[in-house]
Regions:
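Conserved catalytic neighborhood of penicillin-recognizing serine enzymes
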Residues: 132-156, 291-300, 428-497, 531-534, ...
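A penicillin-recognizing enzyme superfamily signal
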Residues: 333, 337-363, 371-373, 383-387, ...
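Short, well-structured active-site flanking segments
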Residues: 113-123, 207-209, 270-272, 424-448, ...
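Peptidoglycan glycan-strand catalytic modules in the bacterial/periplasmic cell-wall system
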Residues: 65-269, 389, 478-482, 489-493, ...
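N-terminal type II signal-anchor transmembrane helix
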Residues: 1-70
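Mid-domain, small-residue-enriched loop/turn segments at the edges of structured enzyme/sensor domains
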Residues: 449-453, 458, 493-548
Length: 655
């Protein structure tokens, strides 16, 4: 039962029509007060001013910003992204405890259920005071407060916009009132009350009742008790002044004021209010969660998904600029990614494993170990793992620099894939022989412009160290014979090898084409078709690019660019937003892909091969790569359903 004051009873006698007349009349006077001095009001027809109020432009209030959610492929939450760093979790009317709904109405707008967007008594008082030159006053109903808070939330970190939203001049009151009236026409009372509680500020970075319930009591808004609800309702008038963490006495007194008002309005009995007043505050503080990849869920953190998350953020920023803007302004989006938690956990464990008898060979603590896993035929990024703690080192060494990566890595002999595929495309048989010696001088070569490329001399760590030997292509691949491949590169054409790599999705680590000049120091200032050592991994690339290239062989010659996002939806409506189409194309014939896979299986199965003994129960193929006496190492491997690339390198000196 609610106690009605005389003003509300007067309005109630006329029913809805009577309340509308009162509201419009007072609104008309309020508009007049903005435009003319009080002494001139007598000469203005109320009807004319009312018409002016009714024709004021409403404008589009828009939605209050809300968090976006990033999911893995199976729907597990990875992290939340908060617009303007504001953590807000809207809840429905039924998810807010009735005592909380009653408490906020009792203390902030006891005429909520009768007067609507306008408080006539308060507005008339403000009208007389403001036009008479006194300090600015204003009557703010829940509807008006809702409008103001939405505007503050939308302003975010723009202080001038925040000031414009809360500056208490009479003109702003009129504007807010006009929008508030429109809001009331669009919402039911239940919707408006829930909406207000979802945008109210409760101090300590707690926007909305659900977050406030968690921050102060570590419970959902649906579970609030009478005493807890009264404390939170009392906060909104002056959140800092009544902060229970720092101002316990003031907060307690304010809570008790709310309880008194609740029993006066018959929301609770006097006995219940007095019992609640005797209770201690009993706070159970919880912090507001952080935003983004440094504040992932426990599940995502446990599998080391920080660098995958970072890649997703960069993809959103670069490839979905309008979506990224929406995430950072209004939010409310659900982003479905390709992350596979099982694969991510396995990759994370792999890169953080330290060989017990390494004897310093792999330079632990200085070298970085990265692993990328992709799905052949789709390009879905299953995992990105780096042996670094995300947040302490935010460089995602697995990806191109434009997506948050570094300067790329040496690939060593894993780049022999491109020469092998080129030879197979030109019809070279598995048993194609080349007589080689070590050291061996190969060349001259011809670049893609028909230019002359000087011969170069190469040594070999796996093949002959002295004398001359004859090697067949398949055996030279599994044994990774450098001097064979630089000569094979000469035979099939250096330009053709580089073009094969480009066709298989390869770029430099900064995203530029391999055929474009590189302005960096040393030999890398030339395009890749001027580098005889290209087949030995002379150009720095991102591990993800190598994983995608090998995945195309696993997919039977179908290249698919890496894809980390499969769906984006508006949480409130479920409406699906467009995502980039899968970029897949044929980069080699199925026959060439099958032939390459057959040869690369031998890396795992042929005795004496570089990865012999590492075979698994599935059909699998692989290629190893090393540089600088093993201080840089790479391993590419794939099955029909999964392709991966592992790289160990020194990030302070990747070349």
């Amino acid at each position: 039962v609610q106690v009605q004051n005389p003003w509300r009873r007067a309005g109630a006698k006329f029913g809805t029509a009577g309340r509308l007349v009162i509201m419009t009349t007072v609104a008309a006077l309020l508009v007049a007060a903005v435009t003319v001095p009080l002494v001139g009001l007598a000469g203005i027809a109320t009807r004319d001013v009312a018409n002016t109020f009714n024709t004021l432009p409403v404008g589009e209030l828009g939605a209050a910003p809300v968090r976006s959610v990033v999911y893995d492929a199976e729907g597990h939450v990875l992290t939340y992204l908060y617009p303007n760093a504001i953590y807000r979790v809207p809840v429905d009317y039924d998810q807010i405890a009735p005592v909380m709904r009653n408490a906020i109405v009792a203390i902030e707008d006891d005429g909520f259920y009768n007067e609507g967007a306008l408080d006539p008594r308060g507005t008339m008082r403000a009208l007389v005071n403001n036009t008479g030159g006194g300090s600015l006053q204003g009557a703010s109903t829940l509807a008006q407060q809702y409008v103001k808070n939405v505007r503050v939330l939308q302003a975010g970190t723009n202080q001038s916009a925040v000031d414009a939203a809360i500056y208490p001049d009479l003109q702003r009151k009129v504007q807010d009132l006009r929008v508030a009236v429109d809001v009331e026409h669009q919402m039911t009372q239940q919707q408006l009350l829930a909406s207000y509680l979802n945008v109210a500020y409760f101090d300590n970075n707690a926007w909305g009742i659900e977050v406030a319930s968690q921050v102060y009591f570590s419970k959902p808004a649906s579970a609030l008790t009478l005493a807890e609800a009264a404390l939170l309702a009392g906060l909104v008038q002056s959140p800092t002044q009544y902060d229970p963490f720092t101002e316990e006495a003031a907060a307690t007194a304010r809570r008790n004021t709310v309880l008194t008002r609740m029993w006066q309005l018959h929301y609770v009995t006097k006995a219940a209010a007095e019992a609640a007043e005797k209770q201690p505050l009993d706070l159970k503080r919880s912090g507001v969660p952080g935003s983004g990849c440094t504040a992932m869920t426990a599940l995502a953190s446990s599998v080391g998904a920080g660098f995958f998350c970072d890649y997703v953020e960069h993809v959103l920023e670069l490839d979905y600029p309008s979506i990224w803007k929406e995430i950072n302004t209004t939010g409310g989006l659900a982003i479905r990614t390709t992350l596979n938690l099982q694969d991510q956990r396995a990759a994370d464990e792999g890169v953080n494993y330290v060989e017990p008898n390494h004897n310093g060979y792999f330079n632990p603590g200085q070298n970085a170990d990265t692993e990328v896993l992709l799905t052949p035929g789709t390009g879905a990024v299953q995992a990105i793992a780096i042996d670094r703690k995300y947040g302490q080192d935010d460089i995602d060494y697995a990806v191109n620099s434009e997506y948050g990566g570094g300067a790329g890595v040496q690939t060593g002999s894993s780049s022999k894939l491109f020469t092998l595929v080129t030879a197979l495309e030109q019809g070279y048989p598995f048993g194609h022989t080349i007589k080689v010696s070590a050291p061996s001088t190969a060349g001259p070569y011809t670049n893609c412009h028909g230019g002359y490329v000087n011969p170069a001399t190469f040594n070999d760590s796996e093949g002959p160290t002295t004398g001359t030997e004859v090697w067949q292509m398949n055996q030279a691949t599994v044994d990774s014979i450098n001097v064979y491949f630089v000569n094979l590169e000469k035979e099939v054409g250096l330009c053709n090898v580089v073009k094969t790599a480009v066709k298989m999705g390869m770029t430099r680590a900064d995203g530029r084409s391999l055929l474009a000049p590189d302005p960096s120091l040393g030999r890398n200032r030339f395009s890749a078709d001027n580098l005889p050592g290209f087949t030995l991994g002379e150009v720095n690339v991102a591990p993800m690019s190598m994983a995608a290239a090998y995945a195309s062989v696993a997919a039977g010659g179908m290249y698919c660019s890496p894809q980390a996002i499969t769906g984006i939806a508006v949480i409130s409506t479920g409406r699906q937003l467009p995502v980039q189409k899968q970029d897949c194309y044929r980069d080699m014939s199925t026959g060439v892909a099958a032939a390459a896979s057959y040869i690369l299986q031998g890396v795992l199965t042929v005795p004496g091969a570089t990865a012999y003994g590492r075979a698994i129960s599935h059909h699998a193929a692989a290629k190893t790569g090393t540089a600088d006496n093993g201080y840089y190492a790479a391993f590419a491997g794939y099955t029909p359903t999964l392709a991966g690339y592992v790289s160990v390198f020194n990030p302070t000196n990747p070349t």
